[in-house]
Amino acid sequence: MTHQTINRVIKTEIFTRLTWLRFIGFEFWMVGFTPFFIGYVVSAKELYSFDLFYGFLIIAILTSSTFILNHICDIELDKKNPRKEFSLLVRGTISLKTSWILFWILQLSCIILSFRFNLEFLYCILGLTVISFVYNMEPFRFKSRPGLDLLSNGLSLGLLIPLAAWSIDQPLIEFPKLFFLSTICYLLALYLSLIHI
């Protein structure tokens, strides 16, 4: 594909919309939805409800805020990575300042929406927020530390997200303990397969 052809593709409206979806981590929403759905169904013993879809909305917003933070923290590395040439930040479609504003809008919206449920749910969401920060930002930046990156994803996907879903209908103290191991193993495998696509 020639450089001229690439430029024509980049300028199309469909491409712009798709890059926005990538920027907010749309394709990773399902990674968060899966453990949330499992935790909710085990707790509430129903396959769908308003609470479930409301929870999905919160997880989607949280995932998007995390991905935007990732783009912000990785901007200098992404500029040197040919695979990131279509990134909105790398191309200058969105500024760093606007990215921070969007991140905080999504992050605060996620926390505010969480008040509809209970304090246990809110604590789980706040825990996920903390992991998002230490995973992406200096001086912690767990994503660049072998072992800590997997631990962060395991705690998020295998522990806090299903706990949040469970807490909508049941107290956290009653969460089935053996559930953790199988969920963590399954979701880490799912996550690792997706990031290598």
Predicted regions and their residues:
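Transmembrane helix-loop junctions in multipass membrane proteins, especially transporters and channels
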Residues: A44-L47, I75-E76, F115-L119, M137-S144, ...
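Juxtamembrane/interfacial segments around transmembrane helices
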Residues: E85-F86, Q107-F115, L150-I161, P176-Y186
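Multi-pass membrane catalytic core of lipid/isoprenoid biosynthesis enzymes
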Residues: I75-L126
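Conserved small/polar residues in nucleotide/adenosyl-binding loops
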Residues: I195-I197
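Membrane-embedded alpha-helical segments that form the functional core of polytopic membrane enzymes
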Residues: F33-I38, V42-C73, C110, F121-F133, ...
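Alpha-helical transmembrane segments of integral membrane proteins
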Residues: F23, F53-Y54, K97-W104, L119, ...
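Interhelical loop and helix-boundary elements at the membrane-water interface
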Residues: I6-V31, K84-W100, V134-L159
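Hydrophobic alpha-helical transmembrane segments in multi-pass integral membrane proteins
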Residues: L160-P171
